[in-house]
Curated annotation (Swiss-Prot):
It is a peripheral membrane protein. It comes from Komagataella phaffii (strain GS115 / ATCC 20864) (Yeast). Lyase that catalyzes the C1-decarboxylation of 4-hydroxy-3-methoxy-5-(all-trans-polyprenyl)benzoic acid into 2-methoxy-6-(all-trans-polyprenyl)phenol during ubiquinone biosynthesis. Zn(2+) binds at H191, D192, H195, E207. Component of a multi-subunit COQ enzyme complex, composed of at least COQ3, COQ4, COQ5, COQ6, COQ7 and COQ9. The lineage of its organism: Eukaryota, Fungi, Dikarya, Ascomycota, Saccharomycotina. This is Ubiquinone biosynthesis protein COQ4, mitochondrial.
Length: 303
């Protein structure tokens, strides 16, 4: 009887052990199958994605538009310091002026200009169409045949007299946002029209006067810095002329003038330039070249 009971117990235990062993073995087999199929690992795409999120500390981000050069904040600071010193020591070097302009073109400044453009019909059209000024797009050969006092003819004659071209404007490359980069590029390309409408020449004194006019009208930091520091190293006679004649003119006219960033110059080339000045609220300053000529003549007479 005892033997039978023990046999019955064994007959119960043995199947249980066999069942447990098969279950364990089955788990191992399923585990091996999953490992073979790669189901226990990240999917390949997710793994690669996680690997791509980590990059070297100073790996430059991808550009946001053609020609864009992304900069870290410390690089922008270094560019500002270097270009500001360079522009003060050698203001005729355009590279310093260009770098200083972009390193101080803060987003809040450009956003304010963009808002002004969005609130104006012409400004909105400019933002939508994003035109760029070149000799080809402006058709200079046609402008020279415009009426004598038209904006187009005046612009052409000013380019001829000063020996400059709209093709020399350097593309913006350090401003991060594409639309804000266009806003600053638009200012840069319209600079020669500001010379044309005011009659100020491309001499150091004329550029300084125009910088203050631009700062009062547009609020671009680089123009304010230029108006503040550029008169320091020039001749005392030029500085007196700026402070007595052209700075008061620039403050008054830059303040009351309509925002020049909204002027679609390409669309109004046939407009009479005197009528345009009146519409914009600009009073033409005294002819700087004539004043400089008279000052030199007077100096020779005294000598």
């Amino acid at each position: 009887m005892l033997i039978v009971q023990q046999f019955q117990k064994r007959s119960f235990i043995i199947p249980s052990l066999i069942s447990s062993g098969l279950s364990y073995l089955s788990k191992d087999i399923r585990l091996a199958d999953k490992m073979e199929d790669g189901e226990l690992h990240f999917p390949k795409t997710e793994f690669e994605k996680s690997q791509n999120t980590s990059r070297p500390l100073f790996q430059r981000p991808e550009p946001n538009y053609p020609g864009h050069v992304p900069l870290y904040n410390f690089e922008k600071l270094l560019m500002f310091l270097g270009s500001s010193i360079g522009a003060f020591v050698n203001p005729t070097n355009n590279n310093f002026i260009v770098s200083l302009g972009e390193s101080t073109a803060f987003p809040w400044v450009l956003n304010r200009l963009r808002t002004q453009m969005l609130n104006d019909p012409s400004g909105r059209q400019i933002l939508k169409e994003r035109p760029h000024m070149t000799s080809k797009s402006l058709n200079l050969d046609e402008l020279k045949n415009y009426p004598d006092n038209s904006l187009g003819k005046s612009y052409f004659l000013w380019l001829e007299r000063e020996g400059v071209s709209p093709d020399t404007r350097v593309p913006v490359k350090y401003i991060t946002d594409p639309e804000l980069a266009f806003v600053f590029q638009r200012y840069r390309e319209c600079h020669d029209f500001y010379h044309t409408i005011t009659g100020l020449p491309i001499v150091r004194e004329g550029e300084i006067a125009l910088k203050l006019f631009e700062f009062m009208n547009l609020g671009i930091p680089m123009t304010g810095l230029g108006a503040l520091f550029a008169p320091i190293p020039i001749k005392s006679s030029q500085r007196r002329r700026l402070l007595s004649v052209y700075y008061p003119w620039a403050v008054k006219n830059g303040t009351i003038c309509k925002p020049l960033i909204n002027v679609y110059w390409e669309k109004i080339m046939k407009k009479d330039i005197d009528v345009l000045r009146s519409e914009l609220g600009i009073e033409k300053p005294p002819d700087m070249r004539e004043l400089r000529k008279k000052a030199r003549s007077k100096k020779k007479q005294v000598a």
